[in-house]
Amino acid sequence: MKKYTDLEYLKLSKWERFQYKFLSFFAAIPVAIWNLFKGIGGFFKKVGLGVANEAKDIWTTFVEGDWKTKLSYLVMGFGCIARGQVLRGLLFLLFEVVFIGYMVLMGAGYLGLLPSLGTKGPYQITEKIEYLPGRFREVVKTVTYADDPTVDNSFKILLYGVLTIFFIVAFIYTWRVNVKQNKIAEGILKSGKKLKSGKDDLRSMVDDKFHATLLALPLTGILLFTVLPLVFMILVAFTNYSSAHNGGETGLFHWVGLQNFQTLFSWDVGGVNYSATFGEILLWTLIWAFFATFTNYFLGIAVAMIINKKGIKFKKVWRTVLIMTIAIPQFISLLYVSKMFTLNGLFNGFLMDLGIIHTAIDFWGQPTLARVMVIIINIWIGIPYLMLIATGILMNIPADLYESAKIDGASGWKQFSKITLPYMLFITGPYLPTSFTGNMNNFNVIYLLTGGGPHVNLSNGAGNPGDTDLLITWLFNITQKGFGEDGAQYYLASVIGILVFIVVAVISLIVYNLLPSVKNEEDFQ
């Protein structure tokens, strides 16, 4: 395919430009795929070289180090303590003691059971209960983990098994830092310099390393409350974990490999068409995200331009009125609006009183109408945010650009399309994929307005999906209502969560890299 220079491209007609861009997009796909695999290969090569260099450095440090350094390979912190860095050495030693204690008391056991997720499940016993003097009856009782600690708990095995792996990785990293510290300390002493004392270490925590001190707690929180649950959720997708495995005779769950992914993409499993259900909900989710993003974006800009227009009075009043929708919690406003449009709601009553309609309109009972309604109501919610963003940007567009355009005879539409819109896209471009992602996971609007209903076209499926359900609300219903004998299907919800992430990540990366603010950032500056 021939590549045009900038001058040649400008000479093309609009249709030829469109054709050129269209063909260029598809021509770039093989190159992009090749670069992707090339990047993946380069990443693994870089990781391999990094591991090899680390291993070489560890061996060299051990061979060339003194006896204090060598002993630190076994007893963390020994070299630091022996060289007078007592505080640093005690922290290393304490971490090692805690790690060994955890592994002996809990970690090793859970890690050993991780491949099977437990073998001893809840069991039944028969008890004799005296209900009258000298008269007994037999009662069958199920003994669970709560009654007998020797019964395996698959949930805890998976959770603590993952936590143990995290702990092992943290220990290896800390051990490596311990080795490096000994190498550095040995080199400093050989050069005749003095090592930092415990007071110096504490002082540096609020001085040159203050950033590390501030980030320590947030990073720990992210690891424990974001990364760990995320890994746990991903692993659940490869098990048969459901509410049926929370206790009773089926308290254990096991690894099933890719079976859950196969189930989701199967046409018929136990009378349920998972693949068609997932496809329809995914399509509606993408349609919803598209309209929810771009209607709010362009209408928000339009409202900001109208309010900012010269001659418009009470600008602060109009902005305040719009901001009121932000000030009121969505939980309250959306539930109220939902009730307004019911069969016996305020809106139907108002139209009937005026004689416009004689039969109440079922806004939430018709699939197409319900979908249109949630998009319209989302516009009411989202416009004020974009209005505020656009107002600030519009005030910063140089006025001389518009004056020059007027002198050249540019119409209002030309000024908008050639000055305002490009400027807005440069500044707010990254907001679009962010907003699109947020709308794909917009739980509040759908759940509070329709609850996912009506249940007309998608009545048969896990979680009882509705016609306005997004992937995120369907996922939620699967974890609450479930379907069939398994009850709440946590494994299926995890699979959907992984697929949602993949879809959102791919779309966001593609759109982000096509934005003018990314491609032409230097030109704008």
What is the predicted role of each segment?
Residues 59-152:
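Ordered, small/hydrophobic-rich secondary-structure cores
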Residues 14, 21, 62, 66-69, ...:
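Hydrophobic, aromatic-rich alpha-helical transmembrane segments
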Residues 59-60, 202, 457-461:
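A short, mixed-charge helix-start or loop-turn motif at secondary-structure junctions
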Residues 62, 111, 179-183, 438:
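Generic hydrophobic, helix-prone segments enriched in Leu/Val/Ile
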